Amino acid sequence: MEKETSKKYEAAVAAFIKENKPKGTVVYDDLANQLATPYTLDAEAMEKLIQKVEDAGISVVDENGDPSEHSLKKDEKEAEKAQAEDLSAPTGVKINDPVRMYLKEIGRVQLLTAAEEVELALKIEEGDQEAKQRLAEANLRLVVSIAKRYVGRGMQFLDLIQEGNMGLMKAVEKFDYRKGFKFSTYATWWIRQAITRAIADQARTIRIPVHMVETINKLIRIQRQLLQDLGREPTPEEIGAEMDLPTEKVREILKIAQEPVSLETPIGEEDDSHLGDFIEDQDATSPAEHAAYELLKEQLEDVLDTLTDREENVLRLRFGLDDGRTRTLEEVGKVFGVTRERIRQIEAKALRKLRHPSRSKQLKDFLE
């Protein structure tokens, strides 16, 4: 591909991804018609294009919304490997007796042959509910194997299994044996979709779109790999070079990836303190300021007591000394049943008295 054509192609791919990200899926034929055919991509280039689209969090599906033939071919090996895995709990995950019993129980169920899957699929087409149940039960271990890979992303192991089982039931409903793939290959796609979407919806306090969750996970994988290779934390520039992303975009993703921390998080060996206890309240007054304020209130009360009751009350209302709400001359006049001019005179007289050295010296220290 010539340099000029290559630039146009990259721009077209970026625009295609931007347009389809909100949907989260794209039909394989649309991908081929809009990008593969105009730029005459060979099989290898098409493979790279699909990988780039899927890395952006967009699933490539057929016209019915099912996994495309390309996706199914990719999942064949993964499905075989997952079926062969043991049903032990993931490393570092504690499981209780009911979960242990569940894993033991599904481990007893025999795997189906390709011929048995076709036989059950034909019965399911006729509405046989028992066939649905048998096909699902024979693949429950597949759900557990796939769920293990998503442990540590914000959801409990049992919740991951539950979401995966929902995806499995969807696969049972939509399985088409005529495509020539084993059911486990078909189910792997649906199980993975169900789990990743559940993680995006439920694992975080602030919801992040599925495509961004997958981008974050990819960034974290690359970050860890670079940490091992370099022996230090990689810079956003180094991560961006590895992911083929601008540095500013990497910084934005890292910011989005930050997890909220609860103020109730226990601190200390005995968990007798919480994180919130150590967060400074920027609006709170210091003990010294609070003590000075209380002393000022006391001194002000003493000074106001030297005025007549009417003078004291006029000043309290005019300056909001009791409730923090100042009043106009007219409002105070209504309270006392006099004109605003009379209130102005009373206020002026009271303030003159307060300015007298015998009274003002008690408050001057608080102005320094």
Swiss-Prot record:
Residues 60-86 are annotated as: Disordered. Residues 135-205 are annotated as: Sigma-70 factor domain-2. It comes from the Bacteria. Belongs to the sigma-70 factor family. RpoD/SigA subfamily. It is found in: Cytoplasm. A motif (Interaction with polymerase core subunit RpoC) lies at residues 159-162. GO terms for cellular component: cytoplasm. PANTHER family: RNA POLYMERASE SIGMA FACTOR RPO, RNA POLYMERASE SIGMA FACTOR RPOD. Keywords: Cytoplasm, DNA-binding, Sigma factor, Transcription, Transcription regulation. GO terms for molecular function: DNA binding; sigma factor activity. GO terms for biological process: DNA-templated transcription initiation. Residues 303-356 are annotated as: Sigma-70 factor domain-4. Interacts transiently with the RNA polymerase catalytic core. Gene3D superfamilies: RNA Polymerase Primary Sigma Factor, Sigma-70 factor, region 1.1, Winged helix-like DNA-binding domain superfamily/Winged helix DNA-binding domain. It comes from Enterococcus faecalis (strain ATCC 700802 / V583). This is RNA polymerase sigma factor SigA. InterPro entries: RNA_pol_sigma-70_dom, RNA_pol_sigma70, RNA_pol_sigma70_r1_2, RNA_pol_sigma70_r2, RNA_pol_sigma70_r3, RNA_pol_sigma70_r4, RNA_pol_sigma_70_r1_1, RNA_pol_sigma_70_r1_1_sf. Residues 329-348 bind DNA. Signal peptide: none annotated. Residues 67-84 have a biased composition (Basic and acidic residues). NCBIfam families: PRK09210.1, RpoD_Cterm, sigma70-ECF. Pfam families: Sigma70_r1_1 (PF03979), Sigma70_r1_2 (PF00140), Sigma70_r2 (PF04542), Sigma70_r3 (PF04539), Sigma70_r4 (PF04545).
